[in-house]
Amino acid sequence: KGVLPPVVTPFRGEELDLEALKSNLRVLNQTGLSGYVVLGSTGESVYLDDGEKELILAAAREATASDKQLIMGTGQESTRAAIRLSRLAAKHGANFALVVTPAYFKGQMNAEALMTHLTRVADDSPIPVLLYNAPQFTALNLQPELVAQLAQHPNIQGIKDSTGDIAQLTDIIRL
């Protein structure tokens, strides 16, 4: 609940700048924001390796005020990798795992495949899952009917919908 903006991942040259990340978060802690999203699209998650992601997770939790929510992007092409990263996010104190749809084999990503992937991640994630619908990046759009089915899962607690499609969002809310 509230406003939780995405946070960029700062670099110095080609290396992570964790001190800049922590400094940015400490400044944001002084605002009325409810929390932050790290390792999402804006955080360049797809370009980072697992070791870099873990460093970011630890730095973000260290710098985020205890009264702020921390959402960490954990979506991966592999279900097992998404589960592993969701567990790592929980270990580092994330409040939610933000799970984008796998897209590499988008021709195979029908409603059944997406349901299986997202349900398995939610089943095994120790923290609540937020679906991330970002068709501009994945070329896959979570349809309202599928979102409604997934919303029945006790560990799926919301959606970040980046479609910009108000009619679709209205359908999701209605369902």
Segments from the language model and where they lie:
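Active-site beta->alpha loop and helix N-cap motifs at the rims of alpha/beta catalytic domains
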Residues: 1-141, 147
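Catalytic alpha/beta core domains of metabolic enzymes, predominantly
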Residues: 123-124, 135-175
